[in-house]
Amino acid sequence: MCIRDRVGMACLKAGIHVLIEKPIAANEQEARELIAAAEQAGRLLQVGHIERFNPAFRELLNVVANEEVMILEGRRHSPHADRANDVSVVLDLMIHDIDLVLELAGAPVVGFAAAGGRSAEGPIDYVTATLNFANGVAASLTASKMSHRKVRCLSAHCRDSLVEADFLDRNLRIHRRAHESYSATRGELLYRHDGFIEEVSITPTEPLYAELEHFLQCVRGAAKPAVDGLQASRALRLADLIEQAVEQPHQSLQQLNTPL
């Protein structure tokens, strides 16, 4: 175990509730050990998938609850930096969107495909992945540490709308088609109403503050963890499968024998 996970394990065994940074652990075995320790101690284990507390995602979740989601699209790009060069882009960046689409899709993953690579020696630093869910929803995710600008966006393509969340600007836009196509004249000009865009008002909140406040509420028994050990372990498992697929190029869509 890394130092972080060893400290988390020690706290759980000492009877202390734990909020641990994502990913939950370096591998599935260590994740299972942390989950078991929390259960044995009767203590909370919450995992810091902080984008769950981004106000843009929270509003996106509310909006799509009343929509028929068809495709989810996540883009998480960063320019090259000296930090986090010892970890792959999947575990550093993409795992955020893996967690979010698992929550939004609300169904097991039954198949996936992934491709990517590295610009130099070291971990993978650009990846694209496609996920197929049991309910017919599909997700397309891209993550890169080689971009020329920082991007943090998640879109939900729904039957009657396109919902776009920007996690950096913390805004949400809903593109809708007009229910009726109609024409109107003004002088000699002809107008046609094809659709419109809604700018959703979002209450500004700091995700880290909201996450810590939520953890305190969980400790006091007023809420359940937004991301518990099992949910975080599921995201880690899928991230591991994506990494393995990238290391084995030229493979087509892989079906999972056991839906994830």
Where are these regions (language model features)?
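NAD(P)-dinucleotide binding in Rossmann-like oxidoreductases
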Residues: 137-210, 228
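Rossmann-like dinucleotide-binding domain that binds NAD(P)(H)
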Residues: 81-149, 153-155, 168
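A short helix->loop->beta-strand "cap" motif at the edges of active sites that frequently abuts
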Residues: 14-16, 41-44, 137
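C-terminal helix-rich "cap/oligomerization" subdomain common to oxidoreductases
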Residues: 134, 214-260
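Short helix/strand-capping hinge loops at secondary-structure junctions
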Residues: 15-17, 22-23
